[in-house]
Amino acid sequence: SGQKKLIVDEAIVPPRAVFDYAVTLGAPASLTADGALDGVSHSLEVLYSAVGKPFYAQMERVARESIRLVMQYLPKVLEDPADGTGREALGLATDLGAYAIMLGGTNGAHLTSFSLIDILSHGRACALMNPYYTVFFAPAVEGPLKLVGGIARELGYTHSDIDALGGRALGLAVAEALIAFIERAGLP
């Protein structure tokens, strides 16, 4: 049908997973970037949608690691594709992103990305849209934004005083940090 569909059912969830991140060493830069951007979008979007839900604390832990690993290692791996440590970090981050969507659903950026896949890859389309939804959702997701903004500040993507901001101003600061991350990775 040409339509992407998400099927989640206990019958198709394996009892164990095997991860061999070494297989990514030969992956082209575009595939590496798109996979990492999609994985970080999973974590970011589920984190936003988890506010007030029973699994929020668990999602916060998952998102903290997934987002930090992608923001820290994607630019490095794109500069040095043979960086095994970076590839392992990105593999773990995207696996955490996959785990995130088992906890809760994605939202605006993923939904909008499907309208853009004729001109952009899915991961890049999500990365393009996430800053906009970050600002849009900001008043309702201040806790997640402080988490993401803190990671961005720690990694040098923003100099804003994240803890002093709230509402739209916080959303704008985090959105600008997300854009700075994409730019540092050399992606449009």
Located regions from the model:
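A glycine/threonine-rich phosphate-anchoring loop and its flanking beta-alpha core
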Residues: 1-54, 146, 150
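Glycine-rich phosphate/pyrophosphate-binding beta-alpha loops
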Residues: 95-126
